[in-house]
């Protein structure tokens, strides 16, 4: 059964994107199918759909790097999530490149390694805004920057999502 999704049929401005009926993404044993409640739109989404990102999905594709929703199908190898869990997910651009599917759809298939339970106290709306900003900030500070607990950090340009996440 078809689902609604934003489609990028050719690289260009956001106005070129269209909502269409598409076949649902295929599941792997390490994946989670999510009934989307909210999906974030980030600067890389604009760059990817314009064809200016270092990974270029083959058109047509469904863009989108993050979402929140309810897990409706769990891959056989996934052990940390259950059907019905409230989840948030990050969709790596490499995953979109290999599958053609991102998070701007009614149903999203995400790698279980990038899918996390949402705390009961958090809304779907707030959860959808976390994966990219916080993931990017964490990667920059700890994986790339080697920040340690005893160090002091000055964050410049903290008005955006990644900068605010770094302060947090």
Per-segment meaning from a language model:
Residues 23-41, 52-93, 102, 114:
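Glycine-rich beta-strand-centered segment in the early N-terminal region that forms part
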Residues 44-50:
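Cytochrome P450 core scaffold surrounding the K-helix E-X-X-R motif
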Residues 114-124, 150-152:
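Glycine/charged-rich beta-loop-alpha catalytic/anionic-binding loops adjacent to active sites
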Residues 128-168:
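Mid-domain Rossmann-like dinucleotide-binding core that forms the NAD(H)/NADP(H) cofactor-binding site
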């Amino acid at each position: 059964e078809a689902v609604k999704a934003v489609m990028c049929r050719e690289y260009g401005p956001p106005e070129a994107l269209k909502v269409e009926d598409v076949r649902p993404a295929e599941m792997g044993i390490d994946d989670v199918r999510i009934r989307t409640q909210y999906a974030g739109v980030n600067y890389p989404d604009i760059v990817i759909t314009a064809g200016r990102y270092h990974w270029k999905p083959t058109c047509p594709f469904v863009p989108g790097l993050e979402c929140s929703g309810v897990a409706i199908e769990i891959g056989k190898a996934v052990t940390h999530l259950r059907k019905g869990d409230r989840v948030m997910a990050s969709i790596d651009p490499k995953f979109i490149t290999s599958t053609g599917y991102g998070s701007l759809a009614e149903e999203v298939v995400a790698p279980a390694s990038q899918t996390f339970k949402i705390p009961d106290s958090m809304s779907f709306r707030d959860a959808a805004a976390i994966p990219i900003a916080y993931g990017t900030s964490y990667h920059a500070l700890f994986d790339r920057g080697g920040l340690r607990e005893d160090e002091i950090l000055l964050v410049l340009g903290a008005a955006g999502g990644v900068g605010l996440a770094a302060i947090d």
